[in-house]
């Protein structure tokens, strides 16, 4: 017996129903604990929220929040980016988090303040800025 081919309208409805199912399953995932990574450079601040295994749940940066050029490096931009990255995970039920801050930028403290204000309990705040152990050889001294 041959199957009948569904009409275009029916195919579209089936596809939409399948996509709706996928989306709803992803948003209902509860994440009780996570890790918040703050990368603060002099020119931008990037905030990434992951679960304990390291899978990215949400991220934001000063650039994606609408700040351009030199304003991306400001503390206010970092605060906005942190709030923007944390809002979806608070809705998903995150209660505790560990914060890892990397970089020398101005947005370090502002992002941390925004994270504290969000209502997530912080279990640990760790500075993971890479430091050289006498890294590369400096250029030779300039003779004038």
UniProtKB/Swiss-Prot annotation:
Could you provide one GO biological process annotation from this protein's UniProt record?
Answer: translation
What PROSITE patterns is this protein classified in?
RIBOSOMAL_S11
Alphabetical GO CC annotations of the entry are: chloroplast; ribonucleoprotein complex; ribosome
- Cell location: Plastid, Chloroplast
Q: Does the keyword Chloroplast apply?
A: yes
UniProt keyword terms in alphabetical order: Chloroplast, Plastid, Ribonucleoprotein, Ribosomal protein, RNA-binding, rRNA-binding
tRNA-binding: present as a keyword of the record?
no
Example GO molecular function: rRNA binding
Pfam families the UniProt entry points to: Ribosomal_S11 (PF00411)
Query: What family is it from?
Result: Belongs to the universal ribosomal protein uS11 family.
Q: How is the quaternary structure described?
A: Part of the 30S ribosomal subunit.
Protein name from the UniProt record:
Small ribosomal subunit protein uS11c
- Species, as recorded: Oenothera argillicola
């Amino acid at each position: 017996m041959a199957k009948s081919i569904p009409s275009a309208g029916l195919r579209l409805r089936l596809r939409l129903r399948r996509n709706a199912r996928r989306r709803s399953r992803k948003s209902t995932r509860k994440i009780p604990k996570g890790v918040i990574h703050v990368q603060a450079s002099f020119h931008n601040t990037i905030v990434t929220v992951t679960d304990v295994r390291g899978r990215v749940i949400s991220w934001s940066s000063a650039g994606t929040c609408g700040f351009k050029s030199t304003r991306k490096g400001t503390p206010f931009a970092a605060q906005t980016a942190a709030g923007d990255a944390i809002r979806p995970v608070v809705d998903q039920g995150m209660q505790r988090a560990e914060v890892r801050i990397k970089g020398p930028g101005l947005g370090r403290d502002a992002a941390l303040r925004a994270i504290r204000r969000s209502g997530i309990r912080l279990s640990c705040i760790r500075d993971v800025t890479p430091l050289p152990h006498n890294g590369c050889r400096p250029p030779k001294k300039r003779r004038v």
